[in-house]
Amino acid sequence: MAPMSIADLVAALPAEDTWGPATPSDNMLDGVPYAPFSKGDKLGRMADWTGDGKDRDRSGRQAYNRNYRDQQVYGAGTSSLFNIQVAEDESSFSVVDNTRTSTKRTFARGGGTVFRGRGQRGVGQRGGRAGFQRVGAGRGQGGDRYYDNRSARSNRGRRFGWKDYDKPQRTREPSVNVRPDWTMLEEVDFNRLSKLNLEAPEGEDLDSYGFLYYYDRSYDKAPVKNAERKLQALERAAYNVTTSQDPVIQELAEKNEATVFATSDILSMLMCAPRSVYSWDIVIVHQGDKIYFDKREGASIDLVTVNENAADAPVETADSSGKQESINTPSALALEATFINHNFALQTVVESEESKVTFNHPNPFYNAAEETEPLASKGYKYRRFDLSLQDDEEPLNMIVRTEVDAVMKNPVGGEDQHLIVKALNEFDSKAPGSGGALDWRSKLWSQRGAVVATEMKNNSIKLARWTTQAILAKADAMKLGFVSRANPRSATSHVILGVVGYKPREFAAQMNLNLGNGWGIVRTIVDRIRALDAEEEEDKVKKYVLIKDPNRPVIRLYSVPPNTFEEDDEAAEEQEEKAEDESEE
């Protein structure tokens, strides 16, 4: 080896004031950004295209810091010392978000338009009956985990999709058309009605009419599969006379037994008004110091609605040419449910003249000389309730005609129990408007609690009215039948799947039904009518109509001429007489 001089070594030294090998300034390795990493870093995804951007999360600053703060590429957990220094424009390059996200897109992410029914408070939603509202991007309780529903019958809402623009809208018609000579006196929304309260009176029995057959307890047993009993159409004479035409109430009014008079079906609608969705109307007649709560001939109050409170309730279709659609409209379902309730109460009793229970007086509406059909099992109990307040100068009493359908032996001994017999009906658990109901044939006895809870949600107003009627009549128990179509495509044949019994007070507690609120509504309406007529002549007849708005949670009070609806009743009577004459010929 040739010797090297000191001068050569000095000349080979670098000119900078550093020691060691030269440090390269380029942080690119074959055109790819490079950064040191730690073996202790948690492994993550190489790429995630399903995560939402920062601008989509509106859950607050805390969630933002948790999910997005200091999120870098793989190896970023070591220190900020190793952050990549961008040497050129990389605006199209996105760093990987390694936070845990769900790969399923849900309807709430896009803020979809959700149609909701009254009272169905979905998670993270507010809103009233039959309204459209925007659901924000994950603003609900817990965000997407409540909206990520894997069931098609979730009832928390749905996103409008293919051809939803062509689907019928829920714009309902009023139960009665407002005429030009009517004067609106007051409009009250349901929020104000829900705040009223009056201590619920117990009531006392004044008299009773009619008779009752004993309930057939074999219907309480679970039916054998594929051997359910068919619902029979029985011809029996049953009456539902309005208040002012009741001869017993007329007699009690002449004796000044009370100031206000009503029937349980009319009164229950008024007491449960905040739960109602469809339109209804009540006629109020004020004559002298007496107030009568009446109903029109063929009023909607007499019909039994189906899934009125469901989030996706049945709707009327403009073109009902299809049979399947026409039998599942609200009007068709109401007629079907009314038919079922009438016949179910008749079929579930044992018609025996030897064992029937007779009340103090015979049926006040039955005329054996004119009627050809046998009389149905029905008991009428006229009961008086004290609605007085401490500041009232005179007591305010109300007489209500209540009804019971059957009687049953007390299982523990004692007096017989009076029953209210009603029926819930299933039309098609898979059809639109079913409200996410379970299949009764397979779930009624294995998941009875879930079935009843769903019915409480979808038919809140109907069950509340029945429970109120049972409490007004001081009935000992309620029998709820579950009736389904033999074929979902036909509304003419039905089968009885089972019967469940409840005590009215306990059932009211399960439904969160407050009778004090109902009595408060009644007392408020009575006070309003009396205040309007305070300066009128005592003998003058004043008539009012209370109407529930078909599309808003509002009731309106109208002043109408005294002869309103009388011409309609006369025309209806003429048509009935003409039809009877034609049938006799």
Swiss-Prot record:
GO terms for biological process: cap-dependent translational initiation; formation of cytoplasmic translation initiation complex; translational initiation. The keyword Ligase does not apply. GO terms for molecular function: mRNA cap binding; translation initiation factor activity. Keywords: Cytoplasm, Initiation factor, Protein biosynthesis, RNA-binding. Disulfide bonds: none annotated. Residues 110-152, 560-585 are annotated as: Disordered. It is found in: Cytoplasm. Its main location: cytoplasm. Residues 300-314 are annotated as: RNA gate. One of its GO terms (cellular component) is eukaryotic translation initiation factor 3 complex, eIF3m. Residues 565-585 have a biased composition (Acidic residues). The keyword Cytoplasm applies. Pfam families: eIF-3_zeta. The RNA gate region regulates mRNA cap recognition to prevent promiscuous mRNA-binding before assembly of eif3d into the full eukaryotic translation initiation factor 3 (eIF-3) complex. mRNA cap-binding component of the eukaryotic translation initiation factor 3 (eIF-3) complex, which is involved in protein synthesis of a specialized repertoire of mRNAs and, together with other initiation factors, stimulates binding of mRNA and methionyl-tRNAi to the 40S ribosome. The eIF-3 complex specifically targets and initiates translation of a subset of mRNAs involved in cell proliferation. In the eIF-3 complex, eif3d specifically recognizes and binds the 7-methylguanosine cap of a subset of mRNAs. Belongs to the eIF-3 subunit D family. Component of the eukaryotic translation initiation factor 3 (eIF-3) complex. PANTHER family: EUKARYOTIC TRANSLATION INITIATION FACTOR 3 SUBUNIT 7, EUKARYOTIC TRANSLATION INITIATION FACTOR 3 SUBUNIT D. This is Eukaryotic translation initiation factor 3 subunit D.
